[in-house]
Amino acid sequence: MSEERLEELHLRRLLVAVDGSESGRLALRAAVTAALRDNAAITLLCVAVDAAKSAGGFAAVAGAPPPDQARLDAAAEETLAESVRLVPTEIPVRKLLRRGHAGPEIVAAAAESDYDAILLGARGLGRIGALIGSVSSYVMHNAEIPVFVAHAVRGVEKSAG
């Protein structure tokens, strides 16, 4: 994919992955700016951990109780509600909650609808993220549409496309 900038594209439908992080809010702010400029609609996507699939993972090995799906879903719904409040009323916005691993769910959601771009924040996992693979890296390498990743670096905000 070419090195496109968000400002260079005419956008109608944006998929914005939100997780409550500062970098996620930066991605949402960039989406709002683009939506106002292009009269575009925004879909906010939050991916909740699927408790049934994660129950056999690290938490079980560590002896922790399995995660409560209702709590996980409620946290994702709250993240979506907080994100909706950041979108001006003149922008059409809808919420989408999915369960699973964030990277594959974001890519799947994008493939299931006619979005022009995906915007998401980088969590800044550093070397560990590089070893295990970050959500933003997964989305950038697997999505069929442009992906824009916002970064929050030590209190300094920047956005990369």
Where on the chain are the PLM-derived regions?
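Short secondary-structure boundary segments
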Residues: 46, 121-123, 151-152
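General small-molecule cofactor/ligand-binding pocket signal
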Residues: 43-45, 94-98, 148
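Short, hinge-like loop/turn segments at secondary-structure boundaries
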Residues: 59-63, 112-114, 136-138
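Structural beta-alpha unit
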Residues: 1-9, 23, 84-118, 154-161
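A short acidic, glycine-rich active-site loop
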Residues: 62-78
